[in-house]
Amino acid sequence: MAITQSRPKRKQTGARYKDYKKKKQYELGRSPSLTKLEKRRLKIIRTMGNNQKARLLSTETANLFDPKTKKYEQVKIKTITDNPANRHFVRRNIMTKGSIIDTERGKARITSRPGQDGTVNAVLIS
């Protein structure tokens, strides 16, 4: 069964909406990638217009930006300490945009969308 991003079939009261169109391909959705803290795994997905999207399924490293020196550095991720998207993601070690990660250089906030971009970019928190 396909995941759709269209309007639901039922109203909040439980009554049914009247159908005015069929399901369309552009309404197609996918399940989240839920990027984990493990050995690097990447999945390339075909999107509309024969474009591609890189799904990062798991990774151990992050591209860390230091605002003081204004330089990037690739560092190893130790653990995920906070995730504003879902509090249960912390114990499952799932990374999303806005997550706070503990790295070799200290704590950092993820600025990229790992499930969409295929990389983990982060900014060092002082």
Kindly label every feature range from the protein language model.
Residues 1-126:
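Ribosome-associated RNA-binding proteins
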